[in-house]
From Swiss-Prot:
This is Putative ribose/galactose/methyl galactoside import ATP-binding protein 2. It catalyses: D-ribose(out) + ATP + H2O = D-ribose(in) + ADP + phosphate + H(+); D-galactose(out) + ATP + H2O = D-galactose(in) + ADP + phosphate + H(+). The keyword Glycoprotein does not apply. It comes from Burkholderia cenocepacia (strain HI2424). The lineage of its organism: Bacteria, Pseudomonadati, Pseudomonadota, Betaproteobacteria, Burkholderiales. Keywords: ATP-binding, Cell inner membrane, Cell membrane, Membrane, Nucleotide-binding, Repeat, Sugar transport, Translocase, Transport. It is a peripheral membrane protein.
Amino acid sequence: MQPDLNPNTTQPLIALTGIGKRFPGVQALDDCRFDLRAGEVHALMGENGAGKSTLMKILAGVYQRDAGEIRMDGRPVEIADPRAAQALGIGIIHQELNLMNHLSVAQNIFIGREPRGRFGVFVDEEKLNRDAAAIFQRMRLDLDPRTPVGRLTVAKQQMVEIAKALSFDSRALIMDEPTAALNNAEIAELFRIIRDLRAHGVGIIYISHKMDELRQIADRVTVMRDGKYVATVPMADTSMESIISMMVGRQLDTETRTPPDTSGNEIALEVRGLSRGRAIRDVGFTLRRGEILGFAGLMGAGRTEVARAVFGADPVDAGEIRVHGRAVTIRTPADAVKYGIGYLSEDRKHFGLAIGMDVQNNIALSSMRRFVRRGLFLDARGMRDAARSYVRQLAIRTPSVAQPARLLSGGNQQKIVIAKWLLRDCDILFFDEPTRGIDVGAKSEIYKLLDALAADGKAIVMISSELPEVLRMSHRILVMCEGRVTGELRAADATQEKIMQLATQRESTVLS
């Protein structure tokens, strides 16, 4: 169903032109543009890392632009911080809700701006609740302002966030993946509120990857790719295939690889019926020795959650794990390591790498027992020799094994974590975003290392948000959406378009 309201086609409410933003070593945005009309829902789409969040954080005052101009109602404006954005009537509803569970609904809406009583000392609770109720009446929402937020469902908490934004007289709302944690009935209620806001002239920027939802709610869609603007089109005049083509249209790596046939190799890891709330829903897969199994999907699809669950970092509600054909119980990372499973987190500086320790101790961190002599003393020479051996094998660039890990490049830090699990004799390895934050040359080295590990019989799961990387490295690809495996692709048959189709649908398919 298409929106039944024709948005204002005159002067934009908000116009961003020529927006540029650079972070150390990365051009996040390059000559981007975006405009929002009063009384429209404008979808913003792009792959992970396309620059959507950075652009919206500039509009919300979280980041400062390095180039370009922002106009409201045709006049140039400066948005120095989130308060300035609020003063201009720009509100943002983050995917991670920013509420205090112990406070009431009304207290959350007006936190820091509570109406005061006669002498300006005490909060006027009656007026506080009355003002909140007035906003809910505008939203046609039956919600008691006195209810503690912690007692509400996620959907109701999201409504409180919207009410908070409206309390600033917001003329523009940015919604980042607003339906990620909602069921169908809750999505319908959210869409009703969005349509009401649109009818009252509020402009809404809607960030989502869910094509079926965008068909129902969006008037226009803008696509970004690699930090650049691609196109803006009316939603009624485009197709899912066209949008996906715009999202993944960058030139692929020209290097071609013929993955080895691992179909006859021993199954190293088998997962059946893995579930944890809404994050992981009946996930099952097999992983063979010598195989690189790619996990693709959009942000929030559940890939990292699966890896953490198998590694014992997060509890599960149900599921069976078999290692080399044997059923095992994994409740903690120590259990996983005991069965030869290693996990390289996407956030290596906080999980997996002791950033303040030296190279030697980081490599030996998970294998300290083997270096204990007579139950009391550490074999410092043995640790040093082992660390030096892996520094040579993995070509870790460091002046010595005594160098603090924090002084090494991202690529070399990643190699240290790999060395740690190899020293621990792990033969099943989960790599979560293995090349995030490292340069092109270091990426190539990591790719070669993964290939070498697979050739040596290691069983590898590689989670990556970069589709060219998934296509280049994987022998087989599983795609996830909303906690489910929605499809499996053989490397020879996989394309970016097929992956994106599976990453934006909710039912399982096998494409070939």
